[in-house]
Amino acid sequence: MDDRMVDQSMHDEESSFELSLRPTKLRQYIGQSTIKSNLEVFIKAAKMRQEPLDHVLLFGPPGLGKTTLSNIIANEMEVNIRIISGPSIERPGDLAAILSSLQPGDVLFIDEIHRLSSVVEEVLYPAMEDFFLDIVIGKGEEARSIRIDLPPFTLIGATTRAGSLTAPLRDRFGVHLRLEYYQELELKEIIVRTAEVLGTSIDDESAIELAKRSRGTPRVANRLLKRVRDFQQVNEDELISIATTRASLQLLQVDDEGLDYIDHKMMNCILEQYKGGPVGLDTIAVSIGEERVTIEDVYEPFLIQKGFIERTPRGRKATPYAFEHFSKKNGKKE
């Protein structure tokens, strides 16, 4: 899968850029108002009791700020944070080394926590619940179990696939927070703030236009802004104008709904080749040259959210809205 302008996952070169944009306190965090309000209470109560915050599960689509929120939680609790990825913890010993290095109250953030292996996950249960580890040393008749006490800590797990978590792991999180797609006005505020960080200016109309095409995702909004800024600077414009914004996005193949060329390819497959469906995911994958799992995890969720396709027992089916929208796009009469 090529890097797409509207891909909600992080591109390799974006990590340092995203770090420079991240707020450090809840009051600076834009959007997710319900989550912010709840976290303010949970954090204040934990600090009043002089206890670590309860374990937190953050879930929702990629690019909505799960890592940012975990850093904010650590900052608000005034503790250190350790950030790791689920797939990088290959053996129980790896997890034991990480947990035993934590200081009292520290935050351990595990991204893609749904990808932990079952043997690693089982070691995590007593660590989360009672703050100890049972490690088996040796093999066969010489094997023995050693208990290691751990300092109280907060585990923050992040996942885009909450349904893939096992029930025992999911139930050990005291706080469950689902991040939702952002509203246009929230994205506009983020875009204006990012433009300031980048040392450029953008008018309100252009910021709204970018927000409309950002798939409800701050990461996409910031990526589009960076590319539009390139066009602005090459054109030697004083600020990012609506004319530059629209022309740039057209060249980037991002339409007014935030759909890119791959989205159009997938919708054309369903609408034109299979007359609106239903059509199976495997068939779509072969038709557009992508893997089934990529379609299911990356492309399809936004098309469903926009109301263009629906899942049925027999496969994916285009909605009446999709027929209307794409017939207009292609200049066809309904």
Swiss-Prot record:
The entry's keywords: ATP-binding, Cytoplasm, DNA damage, DNA recombination, DNA repair, DNA-binding, Hydrolase, Nucleotide-binding
UniProt-listed GO biological process terms: DNA recombination; DNA repair
Residues the record lists as binding DNA: 292, 311, 316
Reaction(s) the record says it catalyses: ATP + H2O = ADP + phosphate + H(+)
Record keyword Ion transport present: no
Positions of the UniProt region annotated as Head domain (RuvB-H): 256-334
Family, as annotated: Belongs to the RuvB family.
Name of protein: Holliday junction branch migration complex subunit RuvB
Gene behind this protein: ruvB
